[in-house]
C-alpha cells in the first residue's frame, strides 16, 4: 500500500526539515508538530536565502496554505 502524505510528514517529526513556501521563502528547523491542514510548528527555525541563514526565529508556526513543500534535510 502506498504511503499517504501525512504518513511521510509524520515520519519527519522531531527531525530537521526544509519548508518551502509559495512566495519562495524557505525555513529550516525541527518539525515538532503539524495538522491535517499542513500547519507546521518548527523549533529552532531559520529563514534561508540562497541556502544561507539570514534570520533565526526559534519556535514558529507556518500556516499550511502557504506551504509548497516539506522535505527532510540532510542533517535531519
UniProtKB/Swiss-Prot annotation:
Task: Name the UniProt key words of this record, in alphabetical order.
Answer: Ribonucleoprotein
PROSITE patterns associated with the record: SM
Boundaries of every Sm domain copy:
4-76
- One Pfam family from the record: LSM
Q: Which CDD domains match?
A: archaeal_Sm1
The molecular function terms in GO held by this entry are: RNA binding
Q: Which InterPro entries match?
A: Lsm6/sSmF (IPR016487), LSM_dom_sf (IPR010920), Sm (IPR047575), Sm_dom_euk/arc (IPR001163), snRNP_Sm-like_arc (IPR022901)
Q: Which family does it belong to?
A: Belongs to the snRNP Sm proteins family.
PANTHER family xrefs: SMALL NUCLEAR RIBONUCLEOPROTEIN F (PTHR11021:SF0), SMALL NUCLEAR RIBONUCLEOPROTEIN F SNRNP-F (PTHR11021)
For this protein, the record's NCBIfam families field holds:
PRK00737.1
In Swiss-Prot or TrEMBL terms, this protein is called: Putative snRNP Sm-like protein
Species for this entry: Pyrococcus furiosus (strain ATCC 43587 / DSM 3638 / JCM 8422 / Vc1)
